[in-house]
Structures are given as C-alpha cells and as structure tokens.
Amino acid sequence: MAPKGEKKPAEKKPAEEKKSTVAEKAPAEKKPKAGKKLPKEGGSAAGEKKKKRSKKSVETYKIYIFKVLKQVHPDIGISSKAMGIMNSFINDIFEKLTQESSRLARYNKKPTITSREIQTAVRLVLPGELAKHDVSEGTKAVTKFTSS
C-alpha cells in the first residue's frame, strides 16, 4: 500500500478530455494596474546598489514674494494658499511677457530678446500706470546691473 502523502492521480479517458477542452475556458489572467509596479523577483543582488532618485527642484517665487511683503508691510503675514496664488500669478505674467517679447523678436527678425523687447512687451501686456511703473523699475534695475 502506498503512503498517504503520495496518491497518484487517476488517468483520464480520451472521451473525457475532449469534453473538458470544449466546455471549459481558460481562466482569464488579471493584468496588473498601470499605476502599480510589481516587485522584481530575486530581490537586490549583493553587487547591485540602488540609485537614489534626486528630487526635481521646483522653482518658485515664494521667498521673493515674502521678502517684498516684509518690505512693504512688515507686520502682515500671508497664508500658504495666498502664496500659491501669488506664485501662479507671477508665473502667468512672466509667461505672457516672454511670449510677447519672443513674438516681437520674431517680427523684427532678431535672434535675441533684449531689454528693449521686454520693455515693449511690458507696455503691451500690462495696463496703463502699471506698465509705466514697471518700465521705470525695470530701467532702474538694468542700469544698476550694468553699472556693477
């Protein structure tokens, strides 16, 4: 008599095999979701070292907004939500100015965007008094930069 752990499966008859192939479908395999990655089999080898991913540096104007706020109103703070809105506002204005200045450079068939194109873009993008103040502040900044 064979030990209990070693039972041999009974042989199937050829007639039963034909019925099972026609009647049964192979179970559908589940595909892993696109967002999740399966871990690699075998783990990490002894010779392999994992490379650390460096974080992408996201440039914001938050520190500069805060510095200007403290110059203008030293006693007033700003919430993180308001800071995010101000950062988005500055990014939007800079985007508009760069688009306009590049368009001006293309119209004049110039390969370089100079302070003149930026100044004209400021006059076109920003309204009235704001444009005048920005042009004067920009001119002051450029003269300070060139003199130093």
UniProtKB/Swiss-Prot annotation:
InterPro entries: Histone-fold (IPR009072), Histone_H2A/H2B/H3 (IPR007125), Histone_H2B (IPR000558). The modification N6-acetyllysine is found at residues 7, 36-37. One of its GO terms (cellular component) is nucleus. It is found in: Nucleus; Chromosome. Keywords: Acetylation, Chromosome, DNA-binding, Isopeptide bond, Nucleosome core, Nucleus, Ubl conjugation. It comes from the Eukaryota. Gene3D superfamilies: Histone, subunit A. Residues 1-57 are annotated as: Disordered. Can be acetylated to form H2BK6ac, H2BK33ac and H2BK34ac. Residues 1-32 have a biased composition (Basic and acidic residues). GO terms for molecular function: DNA binding; protein heterodimerization activity; structural constituent of chromatin. It holds the Pfam family Histone. Core component of nucleosome. Nucleosomes wrap and compact DNA into chromatin, limiting DNA accessibility to the cellular machineries which require DNA as a template. Histones thereby play a central role in transcription regulation, DNA repair, DNA replication and chromosomal stability. DNA accessibility is regulated via a complex set of post-translational modifications of histones, also called histone code, and nucleosome remodeling. Belongs to the histone H2B family. The nucleosome is a histone octamer containing two molecules each of H2A, H2B, H3 and H4 assembled in one H3-H4 heterotetramer and two H2A-H2B heterodimers. The octamer wraps approximately 147 bp of DNA. This is Probable histone H2B.2. The lineage of its organism: Eukaryota, Viridiplantae, Streptophyta, Embryophyta, Tracheophyta.
